[in-house]
Amino acid sequence: PDTEAVLSIHLFGHPARLDKIRTVCEENDLLLIEDACQSVGTKYMGQVTGSFGDISVVSFGHKKHIDAGGGGAVLTDDSAIAQDIRRAEKNIPRRDDAYISELFDAYRDIYYAIDDLKELATEPHALYESLPEAFHDLFQYGFKSKWIPNIRNGLNSLDEICQVRQNHATIYRNRLQHPKIVHPD
């Protein structure tokens, strides 16, 4: 009864079963939020991921399909939701690039230190979970117009980017053959 939305995550280019999820959302008057950060360009039932939900998010961060150096986008066709998003975006602080770079380096160093020591820690997941709060500024900063050319280039090259990723996936699938390995469809 307290649920207002369903967050559907498409992981490693594999779309969630959006037809079924969408039906549940419609039957229960729930918003569908799609996390399409790792599935930009992927199609499900002939439609691109990120276009099924009431709200969708995509990332332009490091190693994503469109790597603009950071940031992301919230997408919606609903004008009321779009207005709320624009209002909220105005309150996101603008951060200095050098500060963000310094934070990112420190975050990465601590993340991998935890990873190296996780066998010794009694609750390593708690250490990982503490990072977003400790590095709050790294996860919330305003959009930078300097990212626009990289985003535009990524959108224009999206088919090629997706093909390269598909080629890599095929290589992994072909080389990682073992009875205990189950590859996704």
Predicted features along the sequence, with ranges:
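Active-site phosphate-binding strand-loop segment of PLP-dependent enzymes
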Residues: 1-83
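PLP-dependent aminotransferase class I/II
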Residues: 5-9, 14, 18-20, 27, ...
